[in-house]
Amino acid sequence: MNSPKTTLRLIGLAAFGSLAAMRICDSMLIALGREFHATTGDASRVISAFVVAYGVMQLLYGPLGDRIGKLRVIVWATFACALFSALTSMAPTLELLIVSRAAMGAAAAGIVPLSIAWVGDQVPYQQRQETLARLLGATLTGMMAGQWFGGFAAQSLGWRVAFMALAAIFLIAALVLHRNTVAERRAQIPAAANLVSLPTYFRNSFQLLKMPRVRWVLTVSALEGALAYACLAFVPSRLVENFGFSPSGAGAVMILFGAGGLLYSQIARRWLALLGERGLALLGGALFSGCLVTLAWARQPWLAAASCFFAGLGLYMLHNTLQTQATQMAPESRGSAVTLFACILFMGQSCGILVLAASLDRGSLAFSFSIAGLGLLILGGWVSRHVQARQPNQERPVK
């Protein structure tokens, strides 16, 4: 059987593709609008469709992962991503592109959240935030690659090439996972006596919602999605329209966002020891807040680039803290709890995208960024005050 470290590297490859798929349209919205004779706000539906499907499907992947094994679900979700990415590359109209992007989101939903839940099963709480930070490195690299390549392809190769490349990445990841994780997947298939029906799962989910800690984590995750991740989808368009970057240039600048998060993932242990979870949440919210306000009102390209870097650093200080809280809010139903966390996060993001798309077409994106920045400053303080830095007594990996 492969070690958990080896398995983590392999699922990191699938997670890379998942985040690349999520962010690949950010830098091509203007190009899509031109090709399909739509506004940039209308073209942003290719992002919101992915996000909505991604969030809703968590309600299925949670119980599915608990029933047949998280790694098995990750493998088949990755195969499905390869198929739907190929279909997306052939979409002839904006409406069909939106539908195929929704299918991509529905498939990709089975990768990262279940990977987080798998880490929660395998890694003791004391090492969990550091381990999640390493998984974060794979997702951030995927996000960076997706945002850059989406803009580059739209400008130089044609946007369809971007989805062909994604299909190839997902296929390779699925084949490698299928070949190397057979033993782990078999080991995680629960006995028939332990399986629960879907109605029982949904009853259990409602029971989770009765827990104050679960409700708090889900509330702040929805706010994070609406205030932070929704704004992230429109930063490349802001860079093009207000700072004079080309689509590929905007994608390249967005690499700095991922680089900021990647820096955090590499030094997470030291920062956690220095600031604690409360300090990380407070500083992260403040950093992202300041960067959004700068992107809203600054005019110098170098300030935009610096803001992207520090926004990435700040967001993942806050988000990694919330991820860790999600793995611990209901340890007895961790797979379902973490996918519920992801569902609410992306539902919040989809709501934020709808508001920001309308503000973009009305020319008021700067005001929306400023309001979101203020909200993130408040959110970081709220999380800092209420986060639970628990140290469980004898929590062991779940075999």
Question: Model regions: which residues?
Answer:
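Helix-breaking motifs and short loop linkers at transmembrane-helix boundaries and internal kinks
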Residues: 37, 69, 90-96, 124, ...
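Conserved MFS/SLC helix-loop-helix module at the cytosolic interface between two early adjacent transmembrane helices
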Residues: 56-95
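Helix-to-loop junctions at the C-terminal end of transmembrane segments
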Residues: 58-69, 264-276, 360-361
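Paired small-residue
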Residues: 80, 84, 95-103, 302-310
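Cytoplasmic helix-loop-helix junction between adjacent transmembrane helices
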Residues: 100-141
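Juxtamembrane intracellular "pre-TM" segments in multi-pass secondary transporters
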Residues: 182-217
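C-terminal transmembrane helical hairpin of 12-TM major facilitator-type secondary transporters
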Residues: 278-322
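A late C-terminal transmembrane helix in Major Facilitator Superfamily
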Residues: 328-363
